[in-house]
């Protein structure tokens, strides 16, 4: 998917929060189309012309170095610049200043300007990484299923990864102990007298002996 289209999908979500238009592509320049990119006058700019435009306007709205490879450059227009400016102003303690400007000389840069440049560079890096993450295929390790089967939890799950034979033996022992507990409980309930104050539990399990005793 084209990085410019990915950018515009995110920008449209922000655009709907302050604009009540039903078709933003009619008046927002830079909207990608099948033929190219639309402009304010309704003209269509091809992808090659859009890359040239991005190279010309890159230094006006971002703090990227001029020698940055053009393969990762995204088309910059007024809406993208406004979005980045608003977000950077939100992070800055001085909300009245515009943080996106032409690059400053590090030798004459003040502390505030230096902080603003770091924020701008960090945002541009995050944007690049997010675009690469969306475009890149998922990692193979994220597609493999877990080796821990359903129902195995806690120490069984850990042992299942280390030694499946021991884990299966523990599971069988657990089922055996559970069966024995259930069997003892049933025997205790069956052998108990109807009323505890009438005597001790009868040793005989036959119903005829129980009736003769009472």
Curated annotation (Swiss-Prot):
**According to the UniProt entry, which residue ranges have a biased composition of type Basic residues?**
174-189
Q: Which domain of life is it from?
A: Viruses
Q: Where is the composition biased (Low complexity)?
A: 197-214
Which residues lie within the region annotated Disordered? 131-214
Q: What is this protein called?
A: Uncharacterized ORF3 protein
Q: Which organism is it from?
A: Torque teno tupaia virus (isolate Tbc-TTV14)
């Amino acid at each position: 998917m084209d990085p410019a289209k990915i950018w515009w999908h995110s920008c449209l979500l922000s655009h709907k929060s302050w604009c009540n238009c039903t078709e933003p592509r009619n008046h927002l320049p830079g909207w990608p189309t099948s033929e190219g990119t639309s402009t304010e006058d309704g003209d269509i700019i091809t992808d090659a012309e859009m890359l040239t435009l991005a190279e010309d306007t890159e230094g006006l709205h971002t703090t990227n170095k001029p020698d940055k490879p053009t393969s990762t450059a995204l088309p910059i227009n007024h809406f993208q610049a406004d979005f980045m400016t608003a977000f950077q102003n939100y992070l800055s303690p001085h909300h009245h200043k515009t943080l996106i400007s032409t690059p400053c000389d590090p030798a004459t840069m003040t502390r505030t300007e230096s902080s603003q440049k770091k924020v701008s560079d960090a945002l541009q890096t995050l944007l690049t990484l997010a675009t690469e993450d969306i475009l890149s295929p998922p990692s193979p390790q994220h597609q493999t299923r877990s080796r821990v089967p359903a129902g195995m939890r806690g120490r069984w799950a850990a042992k299942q990864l280390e030694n499946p034979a021991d884990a299966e033996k523990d599971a069988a022992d657990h089922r055996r102990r559970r069966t024995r507990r259930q069997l003892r409980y049933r025997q205790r309930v069956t052998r108990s007298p109807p009323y505890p104050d009438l005597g001790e539990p009868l040793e005989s399990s036959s119903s005829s002996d129980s009736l003769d005793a009472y």
